[in-house]
């Protein structure tokens, strides 16, 4: 099976041995090429987990900074989500579909999950949440993200990054 790539899509070409015909099917959806280049420029693998410590917040801060927003410095994921929820933050909460559309147009879109479990010793008194940057549509109706964490990747589905958690989406501007 041959794999053809462009900056926005990945598809496979398969030859049916019984008929000799060739067909293509989409393996992943579409992502914004400029956002993808921004993600590549930060070398997201440098934010991969070290033991039980994860750095999703730092990866999102690095990407956001490259896109002109520097307001996440020093915040953990839960604090980032709370900040984006705050009036006057410059972010607004949107649906998954709107997040996809805004990311495909090149806007900074952050996916976030606020962990409500209490944990002493944390900056916000809660167990770690999670954040990632939406860069397009992974599959129909499913946001594609770049993330650091237990799994660190430049392109994957929101489900790969957050599992079944209740994710909120925030667009800048």
Q: Where are the model-predicted features located?
A:
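...with weaker cross-activation on analogous glycine-rich loops/strands in unrelated enzymes
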Residues: 73-153
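N-terminal capping segments
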Residues: 10, 14-78, 114-117, 126
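Glycine-rich, aromatic-bearing surface loops/beta-hairpins
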Residues: 143, 147-173
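Compositionally biased, intrinsically disordered low-complexity regions enriched in proline and serine
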Residues: 70, 92, 115, 163, ...
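Intrinsically disordered, low-complexity segments enriched in small/polar residues
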Residues: 45, 67, 89, 112, ...
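Short, compositionally biased, intrinsically disordered N-terminal export/targeting signals
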Residues: 1-7
